[in-house]
A protein has these predicted regions:
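Short N-terminal binding/cap micro-motifs at the start of the first secondary-structure element
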Residues: 10-15, 41-42, 75
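Short beta-strand or tight-loop elements
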Residues: 13-18, 63
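Glycine-rich beta-strand-centered segment in the early N-terminal region that forms part
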Residues: 21-38, 49-90
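Cytochrome P450 core scaffold surrounding the K-helix E-X-X-R motif
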Residues: 42-48
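Glycine/small-residue-rich loop that forms an oxyanion/phosphate-binding "nest" at active or ligand-binding sites
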Residues: 84, 102-103
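A structural motif shared across PLP-dependent enzymes of the aminotransferase-like
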Residues: 87-100
Length: 103
């Protein structure tokens, strides 16, 4: 899948649009097919001034889309639900695994 990532902090030019492995929903997660993202102030501040904790760090705190898979412990969401979500990273990608409680 494609995602917006960075390997070093800096100006917008450090962002890359690359192929990364598909995320997998854990037992408490939903997997979202991302249809819209939100660019938050923290996205900009962190990209500019904070080294990413891992290579190919997928940026983004917020997105909306459709649930395409649910973890084994999730009862509050089902495949096909349209959701918004907020978590600490990973929303700027084609798919995003996020705790169901954050949707």
């Amino acid at each position: 899948m494609k995602a917006a990532v960075y390997d070093v902090e800096g100006a917008p030019g450090v962002l890359q649009y690359v192929d990364v492995p598909d995320p997998v929903a854990g037992p408490d997660d939903v997997l979202i097919s991302v249809e819209a993202i939100s660019i938050e102030g923290g996205d900009l501040i962190n990209r500019r001034s904070t080294p990413p904790p891992f290579p190919s760090w997928i940026v983004g705190y917020a997105a909306a889309g459709t649930v395409v898979a649910v973890g084994s412990k999730v009862c509050s969401r089902k495949v096909g639900d349209r959701v918004t979500a907020f978590s600490m990273q990973g929303s700027h990608a084609e798919r995003w695994a996020v705790p169901a409680e954050r949707t």
